[in-house]
């Protein structure tokens, strides 16, 4: 009788499947409106400083959400801004930091699609990477980065939750 009682108590435990990894994941993502507000704020900051630039905002996977180009910004600025944003999100680092920590002519700088030039800045919400912004066309990457950071500052209240 005792063995039967023990078997009955153990049956539910033995029959329960082991917990597998979740089949789905969830992640934070910027809405199109928020990404557009970010890009517009960065563009406006550059315009205020007298710079003609292109601004790209990518999601956490590096896919372009918004692309804005000032009417006098060079056509090249579109590709470079997008590349800076893509690089920031894929390297999980601001591109200025990548420039500072990688020597010229190294493999990392030659990766297809990577634009290792200052002006790409990660966008984080509540400590989670949600995308990046890239700016190109100002006279120097430090100025591109300043405009990108001004864009992020404009939406900071929506990112800190």
Language-model region placement:
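Flexible, solvent-exposed loop/hinge segments and secondary-structure transition points
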Residues: 20-161
């Amino acid at each position: 009788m005792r063995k039967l009682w023990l078997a009955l108590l153990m049956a539910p435990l033995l029959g329960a499947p082991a917990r597998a990894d979740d089949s789905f994941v969830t992640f934070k993502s910027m809405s199109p409106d928020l990404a557009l507000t970010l890009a517009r704020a960065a563009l406006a900051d550059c315009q205020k400083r007298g710079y003609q630039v292109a601004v790209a905002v990518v999601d956490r996977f590096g896919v372009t959400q918004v692309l804005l180009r000032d009417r006098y910004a060079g056509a090249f600025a579109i590709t470079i801004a997008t590349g800076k944003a893509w690089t920031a999100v894929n390297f999980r680092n601001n591109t200025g930091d990548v420039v500072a920590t990688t020597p010229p002519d190294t493999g990392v700088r030659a990766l297809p699609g990577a634009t290792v030039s200052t002006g790409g800045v990660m966008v984080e919400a509540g400590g989670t990477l949600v995308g990046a912004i890239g700016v190109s066309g100002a006279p120097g990457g430090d100025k591109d980065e300043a405009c990108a950071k001004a864009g992020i500052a404009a939406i900071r209240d929506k990112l800190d939750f």
